[in-house]
Amino acid sequence: MCVATLASIRLRLLVYNIRYATGIGPAFHLPFPGAGYLRSSRKVLDGITSFVKAQDPDIVGLIEVDLGSVRSGMCNQAQHVADALGHYTTYECKYGKSSINNHMPIVRKQGNAFLAAPRVEGERFHYFDTGIKRLIIELELDDVCIFLVHLALKYRHRQYQLRYLHDLIAKSHKPVIVTGDFNTFWGTDEIYLFMRAAGLRSANEKNVPSFPARIPRIELDFVLVSKEIEITHFEVPDVRFSDHRPVLCDFNVRGAVASRTAVA
């Protein structure tokens, strides 16, 4: 018979703003500033894919993903990485259905994505009501809900978005992880009140910066967890395929319901 037991579910989460696999370095701004956003590199994408695969993550959050525009040669970068990992993927344009950006070439294919092993209950897309980047992806696993965000560049818009996010995660009946690129130019101090109000803490206890990738000075990329989640490892790997470094987090969900087979 099958007997329900309390156990710790161990998972590895990797979150990476890959900047559409456009690379880094001085050439990114030639022949004019920001020109690199118009050209993606399969070599960079393959490097990102190899790195992600080597970490053997259970869940991957990808930010600034090209979902198949002319820039990437019609390659859906989320699907490309997912296929290499043998993972399920869900992705969406980050601007919201009513945004004019949905009608612009290249831009309309800019999104965020989750990749996960096939033990997924469901995913939901939510949208902030302010800011340009509005997408929130909610990924519900058996024992935890994970929210992937890319917050606004403007401070005032970020604060509105954090208020919306607080109300959204309060509805979850499972332990919660909120992760992504928060664009917090003052680091953890900027989201301190949000974390306290939402009952979250940062997995990055030493406040290791993740941006810019070459010599990180700012903590932009976060993994925030609720009290039921135990962090067993956190790392910001020295990887330079993008202007951000990835964040890697191993965690246990304490008190998760597992099952075992007992023989009478």
Language model segments and positions:
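Structured beta-strand-rich core segments of catalytic domains in phosphoester-bond hydrolases
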Residues: 2-5, 10, 64-143, 235-238
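Active site of divalent-metal-dependent phosphoester/diester hydrolases
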Residues: 69-74, 87-114, 183-248
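N-terminal, active-site-proximal structural segment of metallo-dependent hydrolase catalytic domains
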Residues: 1-84, 91-99, 163, 254-264
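Active-site beta-strand termini and strand-to-loop segments that position acidic
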Residues: 18, 115-118, 137-143, 226-227, ...
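Alpha-helical scaffold elements lining the catalytic groove of polysaccharide deacetylases
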Residues: 155-167
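Short, structured patches in soluble enzyme cores that scaffold and shape functional sites
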Residues: 127, 148-151
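Active-site beta-strand/loop signature of hydrolases that rely on acidic residues for catalysis
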Residues: 12-17, 47-72, 146-149, 165-193, ...
